[in-house]
């Protein structure tokens, strides 16, 4: 984490959330398949690399963590905020069995 980092979290505009929703309900599914299926596959790869079981839910949490770490260096980077919102949406889809 950068020294004396100050992160100001501003109100997230609705358009950012709408963008994340469009991505996970549109191109994301077309490009990567159903949310749960894709994240279970990622978990299998990570499990092999790490030598311990990883769940699809842990993949989502870790990806959010990656985006949060990047925001420590560039807190206004819009794409990271969209991605975080998208991963929250992906987790919601997984909960619904999508």
Predicted regions mapped to residue ranges:
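Intrinsically disordered, low-complexity regulatory regions
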Residues: 1-98
